[in-house]
C-alpha cells in the first residue's frame, strides 16, 4: 500500500513530466470565486451541473435547432483508460479539467485539445470498491479538487497539477470510497461517501476550501438518542449504509446544500425493520455547520436497492395559480417528485410515476409516504419481482431543466424489472454486505409485450404533465444537457451515438457515433464567441453490467467497446 506522502511525490512527478508549453499560449488563469459560482458566466462550465441549482442548462444558443445538423467534431482526446467515463469536462476560460476512472485528472487546452498536465493517482492494491469511476472535479480560486476512490480529498494547483494538500476523508479499508464531484460553497468543499454495499455508515463531510482542515461531518444514519434513531433497531445503524455518492444542489439564500441519500444495508429491509432514516431521502444540510435542517424520505425500509442519491433540481414551479419555491426529483423508485423547500422544512407537493412501477399502491396526500404491495417487497428467504429494476426508472445520470420552456428532461428506463431474494450475510469490514441470493440472469427481466427500454422524457413542471417521449430499444445511461438553442444533448445508448434532440418535441436532429458508449455528462462552453459541446465517451460500470444481463435475457451478444475519449463538437467556421 502506498502512503500519502509517496502518492503526492509520484503524482507530482507525473505532473511535472507532462507539463508543457501549452499553458504559455493560454490566457492568465481566472480564479474561481464565490461570486462566479453563484452567477456563472454562460461561456464557462464551472461545476458538475453548471450551476448550484443543478439545472444542467446553458443560455448559449449559437448551436440551435436550425443549424445543429452541421455540428462536427473539432478535436478529441483519448484518455488511455477503460471503464465508465462519467465526468463532465469542467471549463474555465479555456482551461478544461476532466477526471477519469482510476482518479486521473487531465488538464487540456479547451480550444485545441492539447494536454497541459495530467495527475495520476496511485491506488492501493487492497482497495475494495464497487464502481471504478469518477464523476468530476470542482474548481475554486486557482485550485482543482478531486474526491478519490481511496477516500481522500485532494487539492491541486490548477496551472501545474501539483498537489497542494490531501486529507483522508475515511479509511478505505472499511469500505469507504468516493466517486462524486465535490461541492464548494460557503468556504467549504463538501463530499459524500460511497460504500452502501460494503457496510459503511454514510455521511457528508466539509473541509476548509483553502487549508483542508475539517469543518463538519454529518452522518446519514442517526446514532442512538439522535432524532430518527428509533428507525434503526439494535446496532444496525453502525453498518446500515445510506451513502451519498452524487453532488448536491445548493441554495445560497438559505445557505443550505441538498443531498440525495442511498439504500440501507444489507439490501433486505427485514434485516433492519423500521423507516431507516435518512436512507433514500433528500436531506438539507446547513453549509456552515452541517446541521440537518430538513429531510424528505421518498420510500421507507428500502428493499429494492433504489438509491435516491440524485440531487433535487431547485426549480420554482406553479401549482394552483401559486409559485412554489420548489425541488423536483425524478426518483430511482420510478416516481417524479415535486417538493417545496423552506429554510427549515421540506414539504411534499405531489408525485406520479414516470415509468411503469408496481410496488407503490398509494401515496399519503399530505406527506407523500408510500404504501406497498408487500408481495413486491423481497426479504430474507422471500423472493419477489418488482418494476422498475434495481437500477430504477433513472439511475445516477442527471436530468436537465430549461427554465424558459419549463420542460424537465429525464433520461429514463422503462419495462425492465428485477426478481430478488435475500439471504443471511455476515458483516466483515470493507467486504460486500448486501445479503442478496444468487438468481438466474441476475434476476433481471423485460416486461412481456414491450418493445423498448430507454427513453428521453420531457415534463412541464408547471402542469406536472408529460410533454413528449422519445424511445430507444437500448437501455439509457445518458446524462442530459439542455440549451437555449432549444436543444437537448444525450448519449447513453448501446449503439454509441451522441445525439441532439429538438427540445420542443424530442425529434432527433443530429447524431454522431463515437468510439464507445457515452455515459459522460455533456457540457457546453464558448471561446472567442464560438460555442462548443463537450462530452466523454467510455462505456463501463453499471451500464456494462446491465448490458451483460440484457444479453442473457434476450439471447443476444451485443458488444459495446470500452475506452475513454473526450469529444468536442462545434459548427464549421
Cite the ranges covered by each PLM segment.
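Repeat-blade elements of multi-bladed beta-propeller folds
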Residues: 45-49, 84-104, 128-153, 177-201, ...
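Blade/loop signatures of beta-propeller domains
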Residues: 24-73, 220-227, 370-376, 445-446, ...
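Extracytoplasmic beta-rich repeat domains
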Residues: 77-90, 118-138, 166-181, 198, ...
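Short loop/turn segments that connect beta-strands within beta-propeller blades
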Residues: 109-112, 157-160, 209-211, 287-289, ...
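Blade-level signature of beta-propeller repeat domains, shared across WD40, Kelch, NHL, RCC1
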Residues: 523-573
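N-terminal cofactor/phosphate-binding cores enriched in small/glycine residues
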Residues: 54-170, 482-483
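Loop/turn-rich, solvent-exposed surfaces of beta-rich toroidal or solenoidal domains
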Residues: 414, 442, 448-507
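Beta-propeller blade signature
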Residues: 202-213, 275-290, 454-461, 553-572
